[in-house]
Amino acid sequence: MADVPGAQRAVPGDGPEPRDPLDCWACAVLVTAQNLLVAAFNLLLLVLVLGTILLPAVTMLGFGFLCHSQFLRSQAPPCTAHLRDPGFTALLVTGFLLLVPLLVLALASYRRLCLRLRLADCLVPYSRALYRRRRAPQPRQIRASPGSQAVPTSGKVWV
């Protein structure tokens, strides 16, 4: 194969290094546990946001289905005292009409919360359990004494 100009060659010891088997197993368990905790928190947040925002539509649908004579024929006091079948039909129609816009609003607010809390950054890829990352050696910075000026080490100076 011909060398491609500008292509970087893999230098031995430059990339991630495989972990020991026991270390790999322990890290895999920890990574899985952390990802499950983040997923559980995501699910809890989703249920909380959807439950809060969709509550009016779900309440209307619940009372409409519970009290309408075509469905359950409940004789509970809230059903018989306040509305008749046309009122419960109106509750059903209004609940279904409100469901889609409130669902869009709830999902948009959940997405905004996830972005603000940066929940996707909490998920750890499984490759972290298999490989150790080597840190690139950082050049040591020499501190100048308070009375002297620091001399730039390279030929370029950014102003």
Curated annotation (Swiss-Prot):
Lineage per the UniProt record: Eukaryota, Metazoa, Chordata, Craniata, Vertebrata
Compartment(s) of residence: Cell membrane
Gene Ontology biological-process entries: negative regulation of canonical Wnt signaling pathway; protein localization to plasma membrane; protein stabilization; Wnt signaling pathway
Protein name: Transmembrane protein 88
Keyword Cell membrane: yes
Recorded topology in the membrane: Multi-pass membrane protein
Family in the record: Belongs to the TMEM88 family.
Classification via InterPro entries: TMEM88 (IPR033355)
Its job: Inhibits the Wnt/beta-catenin signaling pathway. Crucial for heart development and acts downstream of GATA factors in the pre-cardiac mesoderm to specify lineage commitment of cardiomyocyte development.
Organism: Homo sapiens
GO cellular component, one term: plasma membrane
